[in-house]
Protein backbone atom coordinates (compact mmCIF):
# COMPACT_ATOMS: atom_id res chain seq x y z
CA UNK A 1 0.00 0.00 0.00
CA UNK A 2 1.74 3.19 1.11
CA UNK A 3 5.48 2.94 1.75
CA UNK A 4 7.01 4.93 4.56
CA UNK A 5 10.25 6.80 4.04
CA UNK A 6 12.72 8.38 6.44
CA UNK A 7 12.53 12.14 6.92
CA UNK A 8 15.79 13.82 5.88
CA UNK A 9 17.75 15.74 8.46
CA UNK A 10 17.93 19.48 8.18
CA UNK A 11 14.21 20.21 7.81
CA UNK A 12 13.11 21.69 11.10
CA UNK A 13 9.82 22.70 12.61
CA UNK A 14 11.17 26.24 12.96
CA UNK A 15 11.78 26.42 9.21
CA UNK A 16 8.33 25.04 8.53
CA UNK A 17 6.62 27.52 10.82
CA UNK A 18 8.68 30.35 9.35
CA UNK A 19 7.60 29.40 5.86
CA UNK A 20 3.95 29.31 6.88
CA UNK A 21 4.19 32.76 8.47
CA UNK A 22 5.82 34.03 5.28
CA UNK A 23 2.95 32.63 3.25
CA UNK A 24 0.46 34.24 5.62
CA UNK A 25 2.20 37.58 5.24
CA UNK A 26 2.09 37.18 1.47
CA UNK A 27 -1.62 36.42 1.56
CA UNK A 28 -2.30 39.43 3.81
CA UNK A 29 -0.26 41.77 1.65
CA UNK A 30 -1.79 40.63 -1.62
CA UNK A 31 -5.23 40.59 -0.06
CA UNK A 32 -4.85 44.30 0.74
CA UNK A 33 -3.25 45.30 -2.55
CA UNK A 34 -5.32 43.21 -4.95
CA UNK A 35 -8.65 45.01 -4.36
CA UNK A 36 -6.98 48.38 -5.16
CA UNK A 37 -5.47 47.00 -8.36
CA UNK A 38 -8.73 45.34 -9.32
CA UNK A 39 -10.59 48.62 -8.78
CA UNK A 40 -8.10 50.43 -11.02
CA UNK A 41 -8.51 47.78 -13.71
CA UNK A 42 -12.29 48.01 -13.41
CA UNK A 43 -12.17 51.78 -13.90
CA UNK A 44 -10.09 51.38 -17.03
CA UNK A 45 -12.07 48.48 -18.46
CA UNK A 46 -15.54 49.50 -17.34
CA UNK A 47 -16.35 46.18 -15.61
CA UNK A 48 -16.79 46.24 -11.83
CA UNK A 49 -14.65 43.78 -9.85
CA UNK A 50 -16.45 40.83 -8.26
CA UNK A 51 -17.57 41.40 -4.70
CA UNK A 52 -16.08 39.70 -1.66
CA UNK A 53 -18.94 37.19 -1.66
CA UNK A 54 -18.92 36.30 -5.36
CA UNK A 55 -15.22 36.01 -6.19
CA UNK A 56 -13.52 32.62 -6.22
CA UNK A 57 -10.86 33.46 -3.62
CA UNK A 58 -10.85 35.52 -0.44
CA UNK A 59 -7.94 37.72 -1.51
CA UNK A 60 -8.93 38.19 -5.15
CA UNK A 61 -6.67 37.93 -8.18
CA UNK A 62 -3.61 39.59 -6.60
CA UNK A 63 -3.42 42.16 -9.36
CA UNK A 64 -3.08 39.48 -12.04
CA UNK A 65 -0.28 37.60 -10.26
CA UNK A 66 -2.51 34.64 -9.41
CA UNK A 67 -3.46 34.08 -13.04
CA UNK A 68 0.10 34.53 -14.28
CA UNK A 69 1.44 31.89 -11.88
CA UNK A 70 -1.60 29.62 -11.96
CA UNK A 71 -1.56 29.90 -8.18
CA UNK A 72 -4.00 28.30 -5.72
CA UNK A 73 -3.61 28.72 -1.97
CA UNK A 74 -5.98 27.27 0.62
CA UNK A 75 -6.10 26.36 4.30
CA UNK A 76 -8.18 23.59 5.84
CA UNK A 77 -9.17 22.88 9.44
CA UNK A 78 -10.41 19.46 10.60
CA UNK A 79 -12.31 18.11 13.60
CA UNK A 80 -13.13 14.41 14.00
CA UNK A 81 -14.53 12.28 16.81
CA UNK A 82 -15.20 8.57 17.36
CA UNK A 83 -18.87 8.13 18.28
CA UNK A 84 -18.77 4.36 18.74
CA UNK A 85 -16.01 1.76 18.59
CA UNK A 86 -12.48 1.27 19.85
CA UNK A 87 -10.86 4.55 20.79
CA UNK A 88 -13.96 6.43 21.91
CA UNK A 89 -12.57 9.68 23.28
CA UNK A 90 -12.70 13.41 22.87
CA UNK A 91 -12.45 14.80 19.37
CA UNK A 92 -9.18 16.08 17.94
CA UNK A 93 -8.23 19.00 15.72
CA UNK A 94 -5.67 19.55 12.99
CA UNK A 95 -4.92 21.91 10.14
CA UNK A 96 -3.30 21.94 6.75
CA UNK A 97 -2.09 24.55 4.24
CA UNK A 98 -1.74 23.86 0.50
CA UNK A 99 0.01 25.97 -2.13
CA UNK A 100 -0.20 24.94 -5.78
CA UNK A 101 1.57 26.59 -8.71
CA UNK A 102 0.78 25.75 -12.32
CA UNK A 103 2.87 28.24 -14.27
CA UNK A 104 2.46 28.62 -18.04
CA UNK A 105 5.72 29.26 -19.89
CA UNK A 106 3.80 31.06 -22.63
CA UNK A 107 2.55 33.65 -20.13
CA UNK A 108 6.16 34.22 -19.06
CA UNK A 109 7.07 35.18 -22.63
CA UNK A 110 8.85 31.86 -23.22
CA UNK A 111 7.89 28.86 -25.37
CA UNK A 112 4.30 27.71 -25.77
CA UNK A 113 2.81 24.59 -24.20
CA UNK A 114 5.21 24.34 -21.25
CA UNK A 115 4.23 24.19 -17.60
CA UNK A 116 6.08 24.49 -14.27
CA UNK A 117 4.22 22.83 -11.41
CA UNK A 118 4.58 22.63 -7.63
CA UNK A 119 2.40 21.48 -4.74
CA UNK A 120 3.68 22.48 -1.30
CA UNK A 121 1.90 21.41 1.89
CA UNK A 122 2.17 21.94 5.62
CA UNK A 123 0.09 20.02 8.15
CA UNK A 124 -0.01 20.02 11.93
CA UNK A 125 -2.21 19.12 14.87
CA UNK A 126 -3.10 16.01 16.83
CA UNK A 127 -5.87 14.41 14.76
CA UNK A 128 -4.67 10.88 13.86
CA UNK A 129 -5.14 9.39 10.43
CA UNK A 130 -5.81 5.85 11.69
CA UNK A 131 -8.61 5.21 14.18
CA UNK A 132 -10.75 2.36 15.47
CA UNK A 133 -8.50 -0.43 14.21
CA UNK A 134 -8.96 0.52 10.55
CA UNK A 135 -6.08 -0.38 8.23
CA UNK A 136 -6.99 2.35 5.72
CA UNK A 137 -6.66 5.95 6.97
CA UNK A 138 -10.03 7.44 7.92
CA UNK A 139 -8.46 10.92 7.72
CA UNK A 140 -6.26 11.12 4.62
CA UNK A 141 -4.85 14.57 5.36
CA UNK A 142 -3.60 13.25 8.71
CA UNK A 143 -1.34 10.77 6.92
CA UNK A 144 -0.39 12.27 3.56
CA UNK A 145 2.11 13.55 2.63
CA UNK A 146 3.87 10.67 4.40
CA UNK A 147 5.95 11.66 7.43
CA UNK A 148 5.02 15.28 6.73
CA UNK A 149 3.56 16.41 10.06
CA UNK A 150 4.90 19.82 11.16
CA UNK A 151 7.00 19.94 7.99
CA UNK A 152 6.86 21.88 4.75
CA UNK A 153 6.81 19.26 1.98
CA UNK A 154 7.03 19.81 -1.77
CA UNK A 155 5.00 16.79 -2.85
CA UNK A 156 4.99 17.88 -6.51
CA UNK A 157 7.82 19.46 -8.51
CA UNK A 158 7.52 18.69 -12.19
CA UNK A 159 7.58 20.03 -15.74
CA UNK A 160 4.91 19.46 -18.37
CA UNK A 161 4.88 20.02 -22.12
CA UNK A 162 2.07 19.80 -24.66
CA UNK A 163 2.71 18.50 -28.19
CA UNK A 164 -0.54 18.87 -30.10
CA UNK A 165 -2.85 16.19 -28.67
CA UNK A 166 -0.16 14.79 -26.34
CA UNK A 167 1.01 15.95 -22.90
CA UNK A 168 4.20 14.89 -21.13
CA UNK A 169 4.84 15.26 -17.39
CA UNK A 170 8.34 14.72 -15.95
CA UNK A 171 9.56 14.95 -12.35
CA UNK A 172 8.18 14.47 -8.87
CA UNK A 173 4.40 14.11 -8.95
CA UNK A 174 1.91 13.86 -6.10
CA UNK A 175 -0.37 11.02 -7.22
CA UNK A 176 -3.25 12.67 -5.35
CA UNK A 177 -3.00 15.65 -7.72
CA UNK A 178 -3.97 13.50 -10.71
CA UNK A 179 -7.69 12.99 -9.82
CA UNK A 180 -8.05 16.50 -8.36
CA UNK A 181 -10.86 17.48 -10.75
CA UNK A 182 -12.76 14.19 -10.49
CA UNK A 183 -16.30 14.71 -9.10
CA UNK A 184 -16.09 11.64 -6.81
CA UNK A 185 -12.50 10.49 -6.20
CA UNK A 186 -9.55 12.71 -5.26
CA UNK A 187 -9.67 15.90 -3.22
CA UNK A 188 -6.56 15.28 -1.03
CA UNK A 189 -8.85 14.83 1.98
CA UNK A 190 -9.27 18.61 2.08
CA UNK A 191 -12.27 18.33 -0.24
CA UNK A 192 -15.02 15.74 -0.77
CA UNK A 193 -14.33 12.45 1.11
CA UNK A 194 -11.98 11.92 4.09
CA UNK A 195 -11.22 8.17 3.84
CA UNK A 196 -8.27 7.24 1.63
CA UNK A 197 -10.42 4.51 0.05
CA UNK A 198 -12.23 7.30 -1.81
CA UNK A 199 -9.50 9.95 -1.97
CA UNK A 200 -6.93 7.60 -3.55
CA UNK A 201 -8.00 3.93 -3.57
CA UNK A 202 -4.85 1.95 -2.66
CA UNK A 203 -3.64 -0.31 -5.45
CA UNK A 204 -0.44 -1.61 -3.87
CA UNK A 205 1.62 -0.49 -6.88
CA UNK A 206 1.20 3.31 -6.89
CA UNK A 207 3.04 5.23 -4.13
CA UNK A 208 1.53 8.52 -2.86
CA UNK A 209 4.33 10.51 -4.53
CA UNK A 210 6.06 9.22 -7.65
CA UNK A 211 9.22 10.15 -9.56
CA UNK A 212 9.10 9.52 -13.30
CA UNK A 213 7.08 10.43 -16.37
CA UNK A 214 3.47 10.42 -17.58
CA UNK A 215 2.52 10.67 -21.26
CA UNK A 216 -1.11 11.18 -22.31
CA UNK A 217 -2.35 11.14 -25.90
CA UNK A 218 -5.93 12.17 -26.69
CA UNK A 219 -7.84 11.02 -29.77
CA UNK A 220 -11.47 11.85 -29.02
CA UNK A 221 -13.40 10.25 -27.50
CA UNK A 222 -10.43 8.20 -26.23
CA UNK A 223 -7.25 8.96 -24.33
CA UNK A 224 -4.24 6.73 -23.75
CA UNK A 225 -1.94 7.25 -20.76
CA UNK A 226 1.44 5.63 -20.10
CA UNK A 227 3.32 6.02 -16.82
CA UNK A 228 6.87 4.98 -15.91
CA UNK A 229 8.00 5.64 -12.33
CA UNK A 230 10.16 4.49 -9.44
CA UNK A 231 8.37 1.92 -7.23
CA UNK A 232 9.25 3.72 -3.98
CA UNK A 233 7.45 6.67 -2.42
CA UNK A 234 9.33 9.90 -3.20
CA UNK A 235 7.73 12.30 -0.70
CA UNK A 236 11.02 13.24 0.94
CA UNK A 237 13.22 12.77 -2.13
CA UNK A 238 14.52 15.76 -4.07
CA UNK A 239 17.18 14.08 -6.22
CA UNK A 240 17.55 11.30 -8.81
CA UNK A 241 20.37 9.47 -6.99
CA UNK A 242 18.56 6.16 -6.48
CA UNK A 243 15.95 6.46 -9.20
CA UNK A 244 14.91 2.98 -10.41
CA UNK A 245 17.53 1.33 -8.18
CA UNK A 246 14.88 -1.05 -6.79
CA UNK A 247 12.97 -1.65 -10.01
CA UNK A 248 10.45 0.12 -12.21
CA UNK A 249 6.67 0.46 -12.33
CA UNK A 250 4.84 0.72 -15.65
CA UNK A 251 1.19 1.65 -16.08
CA UNK A 252 -1.05 1.79 -19.17
CA UNK A 253 -4.55 3.24 -19.21
CA UNK A 254 -7.22 3.58 -21.90
CA UNK A 255 -10.15 5.88 -21.18
CA UNK A 256 -13.28 6.83 -23.11
CA UNK A 257 -15.47 9.84 -22.38
CA UNK A 258 -18.73 10.69 -24.09
CA UNK A 259 -22.46 10.24 -23.58
CA UNK A 260 -24.74 7.34 -22.75
CA UNK A 261 -28.52 7.76 -22.83
CA UNK A 262 -27.93 11.43 -23.55
CA UNK A 263 -25.89 12.09 -20.42
CA UNK A 264 -22.17 12.40 -19.66
CA UNK A 265 -20.46 9.03 -19.13
CA UNK A 266 -16.99 7.56 -19.02
CA UNK A 267 -15.05 4.32 -18.68
CA UNK A 268 -11.39 3.42 -18.25
CA UNK A 269 -9.17 0.40 -17.73
CA UNK A 270 -5.75 0.70 -16.09
CA UNK A 271 -3.07 -1.98 -15.74
CA UNK A 272 0.03 -1.43 -13.58
CA UNK A 273 3.00 -3.76 -13.15
CA UNK A 274 5.97 -3.43 -10.79
CA UNK A 275 9.30 -5.25 -11.08
CA UNK A 276 10.26 -4.35 -7.50
CA UNK A 277 10.72 -6.94 -4.80
CA UNK A 278 8.15 -6.98 -2.03
CA UNK A 279 7.59 -8.97 1.12
CA UNK A 280 6.48 -12.55 0.50
CA UNK A 281 3.41 -12.56 2.74
CA UNK A 282 3.55 -16.33 3.10
CA UNK A 283 6.93 -15.91 4.84
CA UNK A 284 6.86 -12.83 7.08
CA UNK A 285 8.65 -14.07 10.16
CA UNK A 286 5.56 -15.36 11.95
CA UNK A 287 5.64 -17.33 14.15
CA UNK A 288 9.00 -16.36 15.74
CA UNK A 289 11.86 -18.36 14.29
CA UNK A 290 10.57 -18.41 10.73
CA UNK A 291 12.30 -16.40 8.00
CA UNK A 292 10.93 -13.42 6.10
CA UNK A 293 11.59 -13.60 2.36
CA UNK A 294 10.85 -11.39 -0.64
CA UNK A 295 9.05 -11.94 -3.91
CA UNK A 296 9.51 -10.08 -7.20
CA UNK A 297 6.73 -8.70 -9.38
CA UNK A 298 3.31 -7.28 -8.57
CA UNK A 299 0.32 -6.02 -10.56
CA UNK A 300 -3.05 -4.30 -10.33
CA UNK A 301 -5.79 -4.05 -12.97
CA UNK A 302 -8.62 -1.57 -12.38
CA UNK A 303 -11.81 -0.60 -14.21
CA UNK A 304 -13.51 2.79 -13.70
CA UNK A 305 -17.07 3.61 -14.79
CA UNK A 306 -18.99 6.87 -14.40
CA UNK A 307 -22.44 7.99 -15.52
CA UNK A 308 -24.47 11.13 -14.90
CA UNK A 309 -27.85 9.98 -13.60
CA UNK A 310 -29.48 13.42 -13.35
CA UNK A 311 -28.06 16.47 -15.13
CA UNK A 312 -28.05 19.88 -13.48
CA UNK A 313 -30.44 22.39 -15.03
CA UNK A 314 -27.98 25.19 -14.20
CA UNK A 315 -24.60 23.67 -15.09
CA UNK A 316 -24.45 21.30 -18.09
CA UNK A 317 -22.21 18.31 -17.47
CA UNK A 318 -22.77 18.38 -13.71
CA UNK A 319 -25.47 16.81 -11.56
CA UNK A 320 -26.01 13.54 -9.72
CA UNK A 321 -23.52 10.94 -10.91
CA UNK A 322 -22.72 7.28 -10.29
CA UNK A 323 -19.04 6.31 -9.95
CA UNK A 324 -17.49 2.84 -9.61
CA UNK A 325 -13.90 1.54 -9.44
CA UNK A 326 -13.17 -2.20 -9.21
CA UNK A 327 -9.71 -3.78 -9.17
CA UNK A 328 -7.90 -7.11 -8.94
CA UNK A 329 -4.27 -7.69 -7.95
CA UNK A 330 -1.84 -10.55 -7.37
CA UNK A 331 -2.26 -10.56 -3.58
CA UNK A 332 1.37 -11.49 -2.96
CA UNK A 333 3.56 -9.45 -2.68
CA UNK A 334 0.76 -6.93 -3.26
CA UNK A 335 -1.12 -6.69 0.05
CA UNK A 336 -4.35 -6.04 -1.91
CA UNK A 337 -6.09 -8.86 -3.75
CA UNK A 338 -9.40 -7.24 -4.77
CA UNK A 339 -11.16 -3.94 -4.16
CA UNK A 340 -14.42 -2.20 -4.93
CA UNK A 341 -15.19 1.48 -4.41
CA UNK A 342 -18.35 3.17 -5.59
CA UNK A 343 -21.09 5.63 -4.85
CA UNK A 344 -22.87 8.78 -5.95
CA UNK A 345 -21.95 12.45 -5.90
CA UNK A 346 -24.09 15.49 -6.57
CA UNK A 347 -22.92 18.88 -7.87
CA UNK A 348 -25.05 21.94 -8.70
CA UNK A 349 -28.35 20.15 -8.03
CA UNK A 350 -29.31 21.25 -4.50
CA UNK A 351 -32.34 23.60 -4.74
CA UNK A 352 -31.48 27.12 -3.59
CA UNK A 353 -27.81 26.18 -3.01
CA UNK A 354 -26.13 26.11 -6.44
CA UNK A 355 -22.58 25.74 -5.04
CA UNK A 356 -23.30 22.98 -2.51
CA UNK A 357 -22.29 19.38 -3.25
CA UNK A 358 -22.43 15.98 -1.55
CA UNK A 359 -21.36 12.37 -1.83
CA UNK A 360 -22.11 8.90 -0.46
CA UNK A 361 -19.81 5.95 -1.04
CA UNK A 362 -19.08 2.33 -0.11
CA UNK A 363 -15.73 0.52 -0.21
CA UNK A 364 -14.54 -3.06 0.23
CA UNK A 365 -10.91 -4.18 0.29
CA UNK A 366 -10.05 -7.88 0.12
CA UNK A 367 -6.50 -8.21 1.41
CA UNK A 368 -3.92 -10.87 0.58
CA UNK A 369 -4.92 -14.40 1.63
CA UNK A 370 -1.27 -15.23 2.30
CA UNK A 371 -0.94 -12.22 4.58
CA UNK A 372 -4.12 -13.03 6.47
CA UNK A 373 -3.08 -16.67 6.91
CA UNK A 374 0.37 -15.65 8.16
CA UNK A 375 -1.10 -13.27 10.73
CA UNK A 376 -3.79 -15.73 11.89
CA UNK A 377 -1.63 -17.42 14.60
CA UNK A 378 -1.20 -14.10 16.44
CA UNK A 379 -4.39 -12.19 15.60
CA UNK A 380 -7.41 -11.80 13.36
CA UNK A 381 -6.74 -9.86 10.17
CA UNK A 382 -9.92 -9.46 8.12
CA UNK A 383 -10.96 -7.63 5.00
CA UNK A 384 -12.10 -4.02 5.44
CA UNK A 385 -15.27 -2.25 4.33
CA UNK A 386 -16.94 1.04 5.06
CA UNK A 387 -19.47 3.71 4.15
CA UNK A 388 -18.87 7.45 4.09
CA UNK A 389 -21.19 10.39 3.46
CA UNK A 390 -20.50 14.12 3.33
CA UNK A 391 -22.31 17.36 2.58
CA UNK A 392 -20.46 20.56 1.67
CA UNK A 393 -22.20 23.86 2.38
CA UNK A 394 -20.68 26.57 0.15
CA UNK A 395 -22.05 30.03 1.05
CA UNK A 396 -19.41 31.72 -1.12
CA UNK A 397 -16.95 30.24 -3.66
CA UNK A 398 -13.96 30.63 -1.35
CA UNK A 399 -15.52 29.02 1.76
CA UNK A 400 -16.52 25.35 2.12
CA UNK A 401 -18.03 23.92 5.31
CA UNK A 402 -18.31 20.12 5.23
CA UNK A 403 -20.01 17.65 7.59
CA UNK A 404 -18.83 14.04 7.37
CA UNK A 405 -19.96 10.66 8.72
CA UNK A 406 -18.13 7.32 8.42
CA UNK A 407 -18.85 3.72 9.34
CA UNK A 408 -15.94 1.30 9.08
CA UNK A 409 -15.74 -2.43 9.71
CA UNK A 410 -11.98 -2.55 10.38
CA UNK A 411 -9.46 -5.13 9.19
CA UNK A 412 -8.28 -5.60 12.77
CA UNK A 413 -10.58 -8.42 13.84
CA UNK A 414 -10.16 -7.54 17.52
CA UNK A 415 -11.97 -4.23 16.96
CA UNK A 416 -15.71 -3.71 16.51
CA UNK A 417 -17.19 -1.52 13.81
CA UNK A 418 -16.48 2.16 14.33
CA UNK A 419 -18.59 5.29 13.74
CA UNK A 420 -16.82 8.60 13.15
CA UNK A 421 -18.08 12.12 12.57
CA UNK A 422 -16.14 15.07 11.27
CA UNK A 423 -16.32 18.76 10.43
CA UNK A 424 -14.07 20.52 7.94
CA UNK A 425 -13.56 24.18 7.04
CA UNK A 426 -11.67 25.11 3.88
CA UNK A 427 -10.81 28.68 2.88
CA UNK A 428 -9.38 29.52 -0.55
CA UNK A 429 -7.15 32.57 -0.16
Model regions and ranges:
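Signature for the C-terminal beta-barrel architecture of outer-membrane proteins
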Residues: 164-165, 196-312, 316-330, 346
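Outer membrane beta-barrel transmembrane domains
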Residues: 253-256, 270-299, 306, 311-312, ...
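N-terminal periplasmic/intermembrane-space "pro-region" immediately following the signal or transit peptide
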Residues: 2-6, 30-32, 36-82, 88, ...
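Short loop/turn motifs that connect adjacent beta-strands in outer-membrane beta-barrel proteins
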Residues: 53-71, 102-116, 165, 221, ...
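Surface-exposed loop and membrane-interface regions of Gram-negative outer-membrane beta-barrel proteins
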Residues: 81-95, 110-157, 242, 411
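Outer-membrane beta-barrel "beta-signal"
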Residues: 417-429
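Transmembrane beta-barrel strands of outer-membrane/channel proteins
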Residues: 71-79, 116-122, 168-172, 224-230, ...
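Surface-exposed coil loops of outer-membrane beta-barrel proteins
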Residues: 130-158, 165-253, 372, 379-380
